[in-house]
């Protein structure tokens, strides 16, 4: 869980920007989207294989 402390004389927008950056770095949002629905192991393997193939192509 990402957590930030709002600094003295820091605007809410700046604090929100820092929070969003920390969430992105931690991968929290991406992980939540990935776990939103159950994915069968066979589908997971297929997606992983296609991603590797795509990376290799580039």
UniProtKB/Swiss-Prot annotation:
One MF annotation (Gene Ontology) recorded for this entry: structural constituent of ribosome
Bilayer-crossing regions: none
Compositionally biased residues, Basic residues: 43-58
Gene Ontology terms: cellular component: ribonucleoprotein complex; ribosome
UniProt-listed InterPro entries: Ribosomal_bS21, Ribosomal_bS21_CS, Ribosomal_bS21_sf
Coiled-coil blocks: none
Keyword Membrane annotated: no
Compositionally biased region (Basic and acidic residues): 31-42
Region (Disordered): 24-58
Top-level division of the source organism's lineage: Bacteria
Keywords, comma-separated and alphabetical: Ribonucleoprotein, Ribosomal protein
Example GO BP: translation
The keyword Nucleotide-binding belongs to this UniProt entry's keyword annotation: no
Family: Belongs to the bacterial ribosomal protein bS21 family.
Name of this chain's protein: Small ribosomal subunit protein bS21
Name of the coding gene: rpsU
């Amino acid at each position: 869980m990402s957590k930030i402390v709002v600094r003295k004389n820091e605007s809410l927008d700046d604090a929100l920007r820092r929070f969003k950056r920390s969430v992105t770095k931690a991968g929290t949002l991406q992980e939540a989207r990935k776990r939103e629905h159950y994915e069968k192991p066979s589908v997971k393997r297929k997606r992983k294989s296609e991603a590797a193939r795509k990376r290799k192509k580039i």
